[in-house]
């Protein structure tokens, strides 16, 4: 016991010696510290970023100028990906099919596309996963031509007619089929025509080559303002989406191979952070903010039209990137009804999306 006491006293003496030998802070030191604290008081708290497994990311998208992918555009234009340490290269695919092929072949790391594509891949035993949601409604409207369907009264009048969709098998095709079925018209009783999402679709409707159209923004608003179309079903709103699908319908998302997500969790988190940051910005963005941020070419030579289209889809944008609880089930049911090769019992819904990244980003950005 005596030995232990001596050790204690010896340690105490060393502690006192160390304290006495430490230089006392001078007035200059105190002033410097105060200035440093004052200088950093207004700066945001920096979040320590874990090391990214992959910093250079190839992302493929079909129709990036569409409002369907506005969160991606905003995150890119405002430098949110760079801020997260991501060197993002966005490649425009010629079609949804081409975008799908790019990500499934490994030519692209990530795809910005419809959640339905993930369900379709999973039904074929190709394991892909959505890791952040951009849209909580499809933003697609179905309308009839005012030229060839003048005096339109009922969906039954569309039997035997030509219906324009962005692409065969696309969300616009699925929605057109559902709307027709609700009106007693089978999809095989009409002729679907792939017209894309650009000016060519408008020209086809304007010249009488189409009798109806199912498409996305800003194309629909442009056709409405020109008096070329009369909208009869609208998933640009949450209410309209429930009317068509009976529940929430997830739309655009970022998705990748499940193995890629598992091996690159920090990278996926960084990309999710960028998208959720963009989604939060969009919640309060005014017309001037949109005009200053979105590339001029996306406006199709009409800023007013683009802003009108934005307001029509605004509520369809996800507020936080999180997949809604009933969304996957609603989407799978719609896919199974549209495509007989998609079997509900063959798709494990929990494996088609990952909410962990979005939940963390939501907390970080208070989205």
Task: Set out the residue ranges of the language-model regions.
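Secretory targeting signals
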Residues: 1-25
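N-terminal export signals
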Residues: 22, 29-48
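Short, glycine-/small- and polar/acidic-enriched structural segments
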Residues: 49-197, 204-217, 221, 228, ...
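Short Gly/Pro-enriched turn/cap motifs at secondary-structure boundaries
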Residues: 63, 244-245, 323
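A generic alpha-helix surface/boundary motif
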Residues: 75, 115, 174, 254-255, ...
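Pocket-lining segment of extracytoplasmic ligand-binding domains
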Residues: 200-295
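Secondary-structure end/capping motifs
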Residues: 261-342
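Conserved C-terminal helix/tail region of periplasmic/extracytoplasmic solute-binding proteins
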Residues: 332-367
């Amino acid at each position: 016991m005596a030995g232990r006491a001596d050790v204690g006293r010896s340690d105490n003496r060393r502690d006192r010696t160390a304290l006495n030998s430490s230089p006392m802070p001078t007035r200059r030191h105190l002033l410097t510290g105060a200035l440093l604290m004052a200088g950093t008081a207004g700066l945001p708290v920096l979040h320590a970023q874990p090391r990214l497994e992959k910093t250079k990311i190839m992302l493929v998208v079909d129709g990036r100028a569409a409002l369907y992918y506005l969160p991606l555009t905003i995150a890119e234009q405002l430098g949110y990906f760079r801020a997260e340490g991501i060197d993002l290269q966005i490649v425009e695919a010629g079609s949804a099919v081409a975008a799908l092929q790019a990500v499934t072949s490994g030519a692209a790391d990530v795809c910005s596309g419809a959640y339905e594509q993930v369900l379709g891949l999973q039904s074929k035993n190709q394991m892909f996963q959505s890791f952040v949601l951009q849209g909580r409604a499809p933003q697609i409207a179905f309308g009839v031509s005012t030229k060839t369907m003048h005096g339109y009264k009922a969906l039954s009048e569309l039997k035997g007619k030509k219906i324009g969709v962005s692409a065969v098998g696309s969300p616009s095709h699925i929605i057109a089929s559902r709307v027709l079925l609700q009106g007693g018209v089978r999809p095989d009783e009409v002729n679907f025509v792939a017209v894309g999402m650009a000016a060519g679709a408008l020209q086809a409707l304007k010249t009488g080559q189409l009798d109806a159209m199912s498409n996305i923004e800003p194309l629909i608003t442009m056709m409405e303002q020109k008096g070329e179309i009369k909208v009869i079903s609208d998933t640009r709103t949450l209410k309209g989406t429930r009317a068509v699908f009976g529940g929430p319908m997830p739309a655009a998302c970022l998705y990748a191979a499940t193995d890629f997500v598992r091996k690159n969790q920090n990278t996926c988190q960084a990309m999710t952070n960028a998208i959720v940051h963009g989604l939060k910005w969009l919640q309060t963005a005014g017309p001037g903010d949109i005009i200053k941020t979105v590339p001029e070419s996306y406006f199709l030579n009409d800023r007013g039209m683009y802003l009108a289209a934005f307001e029509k889809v605004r509520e369809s944008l996800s507020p936080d990137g999180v997949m809604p609880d009933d969304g996957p089930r609603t989407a799978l049911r719609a896919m199974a009804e549209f495509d007989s090769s998609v079997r509900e019992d063959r798709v494990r819904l929990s494996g088609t999306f990952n909410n962990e990244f979005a939940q963390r980003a939501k907390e970080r950005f208070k989205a």
